[in-house]
């Protein structure tokens, strides 16, 4: 088994041990060093391994935001200097590289991660060093660290609206398919609680390791269970194999629609639009989202990386993270961690998905939920939205059916 595909439980244990060891050699100063003509910032994503299909373009979007900030004069009169590291789809590596960025490179903040396993591996590193991580991807909720800002959706801004949409469409029998690590298992625990309270039935639940590419057995079980819909929490390039297997088995989106929460435009391109057109996704941003800020973002991304490139929700959330951090630093007048945290509370910016506001109570952001339908050209057409940004509720305190989940 490759290093990137270790058991998530073993990997997380190793990551915590590494973080403890790193912490014993001394803590970095809070907020990093901003001496000289530049301010160093860390960019930490999987540039290799099974998660590279998703994370490389998040890095690209964050670097674009850094370039735009520098072109406008920088922050506090200084240019931003990105220090890019590869988490290699391996959770202990994320912990190691996070510690390096903080203590050796002395960055002011870090933008990074995708999987919840990588985030949980990094969390103790940032908390011990009192340094800030800006995490750009939707996740399962039930977490709120004082040293993480979460610019992707939490559960009540993505998974719950996705379930609401299925229920409103009359889909009562649901089959759960996910990768075998913390996000899908926790998300499905939440989904099962929702289903029990809302007259839905879970007719199957299957997990496969990250990087898994053989889905004939899972697809056969889908055919036998005959659900009204599939809720998909697979991550990385496993989605390519899964949707190809679905199509190969003759299972159509009309007969058995799949709602995915980790498949966006970039993944659609990798899967092949022919294999996924007609299926649903739940996010907060699409390349087709209307608005001048998004038109500018899409044009800038294509100008920087190529006219054939697409934008997606995690990319946009990574881009937003850089802009929000820069606004907080400008407001604070320093890169010092506690000052930036205090300044970030309530900051609102007009960003590609719309107005994004940081909730000072939990360091998540208000986000509009959007359900989309994958089109034959690989773009995603919005078919429903929440009408206004939803206040983040990472512990689902506003839902009686979620009592006892946290």
Where are these regions (language model features)?
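Solvent-exposed, acidic/polar segments of extracytosolic/periplasmic ligand-binding ectodomains
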Residues: 351-406
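Short, low-complexity disordered leader/linker segments with a strong preference
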Residues: 1-40, 71, 402-406
């Amino acid at each position: 088994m490759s290093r990137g595909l270790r058991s998530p439980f073993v990997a997380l244990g190793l990551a915590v041990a590494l973080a403890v060891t790193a912490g014993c050699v001394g803590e970095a100063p809070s907020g990093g060093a901003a001496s000289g003509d530049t301010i160093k910032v860390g960019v930490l994503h999987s540039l290799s391994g099974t998660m590279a299909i998703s994370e490389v373009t998040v890095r690209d979007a964050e670097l674009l935001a850094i370039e735009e900030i520098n072109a406008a004069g920088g922050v506090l009169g200084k240019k931003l200097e990105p220090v890019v590291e590869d988490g290699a789809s391996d959770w202990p590596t994320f912990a190691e590289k996070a510690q390096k960025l903080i203590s050796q490179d002395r960055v002011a903040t870090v933008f990074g991660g995708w999987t919840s396993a990588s985030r949980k591996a990094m969390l103790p590193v940032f908390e011990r060093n009192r340094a800030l991580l800006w995490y750009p991807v939707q996740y399962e909720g039930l977490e709120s660290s004082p040293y993480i800002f979460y610019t992707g959706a939490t559960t009540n801004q993505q998974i719950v609206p996705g379930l609401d949409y299925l229920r409103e469409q009359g889909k009562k029998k649901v089959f759960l398919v996910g990768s075998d690590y913390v996000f899908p298992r926790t998300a499905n625990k939440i989904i099962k609680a929702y289903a029990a309270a809302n007259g839905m039935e879970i007719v199957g639940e299957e997990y496969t390791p990250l990087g898994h590419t053989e889905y004939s057995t899972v697809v056969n079980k889908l055919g036998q269970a005959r659900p009204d819909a599939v809720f998909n929490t697979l991550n990385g390039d496993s989605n390519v194999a899964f949707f190809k297997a679905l199509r190969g088995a003759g299972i159509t989106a009309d007969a058995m629609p799949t709602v995915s929460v980790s498949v966006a435009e970039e993944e659609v391109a990798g899967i092949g639009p022919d294999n996924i057109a007609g299926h649903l996704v739940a996010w907060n941003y699409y390349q087709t989202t209307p608005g001048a800020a998004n038109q500018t973002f899409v044009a800038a991304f294509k100008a920087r990386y190529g006219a054939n490139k697409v934008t997606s929700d995690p990319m946009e959330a990574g881009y937003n993270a850089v802009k929000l951090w820069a606004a907080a630093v400008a407001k604070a007048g320093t890169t010092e961690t506690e000052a930036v945290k205090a300044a970030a509370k309530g900051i609102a910016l007009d960003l590609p998905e719309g107005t994004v506001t940081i909730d000072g109570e939990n360091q998540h952001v208000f986000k509009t939920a959007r359900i989309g339908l994958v089109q034959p050209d690989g773009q995603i057409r919005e078919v429903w939205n929440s009408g206004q940004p939803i206040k983040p509720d990472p512990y689902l305190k506003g839902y009686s059916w979620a009592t006892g989940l946290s």
